[in-house]
Design a protein with these regions (language model features):
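Short, aliphatic-rich beta-strand segments
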Residues: 127, 134-143, 205-209, 309
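Rossmann-like S-adenosyl-L-methionine
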Residues: 148-394
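Short cysteine clusters
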Residues: 3-5, 10-13, 340
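Extended interfacial segments that mediate partner engagement and assembly in macromolecular machines
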Residues: 11-114, 127, 132, 146-147
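Short helix/loop segment immediately N-terminal to the Walker
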Residues: 112-119, 240
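Short, acidic/hydrophobic/Gly-rich beta-strand patch recurrent on exposed beta strands
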Residues: 72-75, 139-141, 274
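Nucleotide donor/acceptor-binding cores
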Residues: 55, 134-136, 237-238
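Extracellular/lumenal ectodomain signal focusing on beta-strand-rich modules
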Residues: 43, 56, 124, 170, ...
Length: 394
């Protein structure tokens, strides 16, 4: 499929020129080359419609033609903003919403932030959509706490989105006055609605705030988490540890099939979301704690605590030797490793294999079509497990 942005050095879809079937084959072969020696690699799970899957958009403001405000993404290997009217990966509702944001911002005569001079007002716009609910969030990131004519901006935005057939659920101002490439700041002000949206995933409803971690491809996330829970082989009697749990999506998906779930996540905002999500869904057998996963599991293992199943979903850099050693000390019957980087998964598997775990198999999931990223679900098992269960310690 042709894309004008791809021809302008967008850099967001390096595999766009490759037939989708060939993309899937390439990714599956990469996983097999890296992980095949540890166990069988099952066919990759691709998408039937590998376009417009992203439920989250981040757009950067800049000066466009005629001095008007425009927005888009940085061109590859540069700080030049490439204007974006629409994108083959983005939810089409969010494309229309961003068009409305630009129109409203121009109507209010907002000036884009200049990162070199430190002048201007609006820096970025973050958009999120609950695909199952249709709810839309607009987050306007400003360099200053005061947003002149905030009510007029909201009024103009709602009018512009309505003209495009879009209903906005909430509008939030996020303040980021630092000189940084990080998009969001710490301070927020709700300008319209409740400041969050809802979405449904794997039978559970999640509240998504501006800073919440939530997978950008809900269709493939359901596939990924379904595979992970299936790999755990839960019977309803297990105590489960959900490490690097984020807002609790894997743990809450597994909770219906387990005796108890204990989730651990470093990001305190995410943990608060996880606790709220458990309450909202009536899940009473899940507890979540804000802590570094390596430190938490090391202390739990040193205290002699055990788990029947451990889910681990670490960042791209993978886990740590200390974490993996503590996994072995906790002696779960099964470990389900959800990886977003097959290179670090291979590294961690070498350690887990030495610690007595065997990989039963790997299923790649194409979470991000037209990019080089690959998600992989790996199930590992170990026999003769005995000991105490996690107590939900702090």
């Amino acid at each position: 499929m042709d894309c004008k942005l791809h021809a302008k050095n967008c850099g967001g879809c390096p595999l766009l020129g490759l037939d989708y079937a060939a993309q899937l084959k390439q990714k599956e072969e990469k996983v097999r080359a890296l992980l095949g020696k540890y166990g069988p690699v099952h066919p990759i799970r691709g998408m039937e419609q590998p376009y417009h899957y992203r439920n989250k958009v981040i757009s950067t403001f800049a000066v466009g033609w005629g001095g008007k405000l425009t927005s888009g993404i940085y061109a590859a290997n540069s700080h030049k903003v490439l204007p974006v009217e629409s994108c083959l990966l983005q939810d089409e509702v969010l494309d229309k919403t961003m068009q409305a944001v630009r129109a409203a911002a121009n109507a209010c005569r907002y000036q884009p932030y200049d990162e070199d001079k430190g002048t201007g007002l609006v820096r970025h716009c973050l958009l999120r959509r609950g695909v199952a609910t249709g709810q839309v969030m607009v987050v306007l990131v400003t360099a200053q706490p005061v947003l002149p004519g905030a009510k007029n901006f909201v009024k103009a935005l709602l009018a512009e989105t309505a003209q495009r057939g879009v209903t906005v659920t909430t509008v939030v101002q996020n303040v980021n006055s630092r000189k940084t490439s990080v998009v969001l700041g710490e301070a927020e002000k709700v300008l319209y609605g409740k400041g969050f949206i809802l979405d449904t995933l794997c039978g559970k409803t999640y509240a998504i705030s501006p800073r919440s971690f939530y997978q950008v491809n809900p269709a493939q996330t359901a596939v990924l988490y379904g595979l992970a829970v299936e790999a755990a082989k839960l019977t309803g009697k297990e105590v489960v540890l959900d490490a690097y749990c984020g807002i609790g999506t894997i743990g809450l998906t597994a909770a219906d099939h387990a005796k108890q779930v204990v989730g651990v996540e470093l990001n305190r905002d995410a943990v608060q979301d996880a606790i709220g999500n458990a309450k909202h869904n009536g899940v009473k057998n899940a507890r979540f704690f804000a802590a570094d996963a390596t430190r938490w599991i090391s202390e739990a293992a040193a205290a002699g605590e055990k788990a029947d199943v451990i889910f681990m979903d670490p960042p791209r850099e993978g886990s740590t030797p200390e974490f993996l050693a503590s996994v072995a000390r906790m002696a779960p019957k099964r470990v389900v490793y959800v990886s977003c980087n097959p290179v670090t998964l291979a590294r961690d598997l070498a350690t887990l294999t030495k610690l007595g775990y065997k990989a039963e198999g790997f299923t790649p999931v194409d979470m991000f079509p037209h990019t080089e990223h690959i998600e992989t679900v790996c199930a590992l098992s170990k026999r003769d497990i005995h000991g105490k269960k996690p107590s939900g310690r702090r």
